[in-house]
Amino acid sequence: MPAVAQEKFIVVASTTSTEDSGLFKHLLPLFKANSGIDARVVAQGTGQALATAKKGDADVVFVHDRVAEQKFVDEGFGIERREVMYNDFVVVGPIADPVKISGSKDVIGALKKIAASQSPFTSRGDRSGTHAAELRYWKLAGIDPQTGKGSWYRETGSGMGPTLNTASAMGAYAFTDRGTWLSFKNRGDLVIVVEGDTKLFNQYGVMLVNPAKHPHVKSELGVQFIDWLTSAEGQAAIAAYKIEGQQLFFPNYKKAS
């Protein structure tokens, strides 16, 4: 079938949050209608997504760990990096809130209380951008959560959805991006307990896998995707994605001067 042979597609290694939140189901048909290019997503934690791209198994990377992204660029694996959008992280926990942190805007103080009381906490433990952020906050709190591993601190080794399922089943606290939380249906008794701390800002970046490292990378098609995401149309499409009236991601691409 000639139509199949001629189909234009790229592989996008991306975070589970952009997939689990439903953002890609909203964006990708719009991009395809605009360009004729099918973007096929491999949804993994940020660490795994960057590893996939490093091997040349993706054309574009769309992730949220600024430090890991910069390292990827510095090592020559990524080019054309642009900041696309942001949302924020929140801490969720059982409505009974045994640690009494509900309504707090202090993520560090909340984590200290969780650790001091040894209240159950579920972590992704999967080298994702969300996991990396969670570990940064534990470090800022002066706590090594690994000391609680096997007792109050439990790593699922999986994506945000399964980790929230585990937290819901255990009545545990968890750290999540707001986008996945808003689209997550199986909340049980879980509610947001900590939000609004400026430290919880969560930036997403997109970049092309460097064709100088992997000549088979579809750089022209990949750049079209990046250009669309950062265009007025793409940015408006990101802003338009809502669940129950709540915007999940906020476009913030700024053209380099």
Task: Mark where each language-model region is.
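Exported/periplasmic ABC-transporter solute-binding proteins
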Residues: 5-43, 47, 51-57, 66, ...
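Short, conserved active-site loops that position catalytic residues or coordinate cofactors/metal ions
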Residues: 56, 87-88
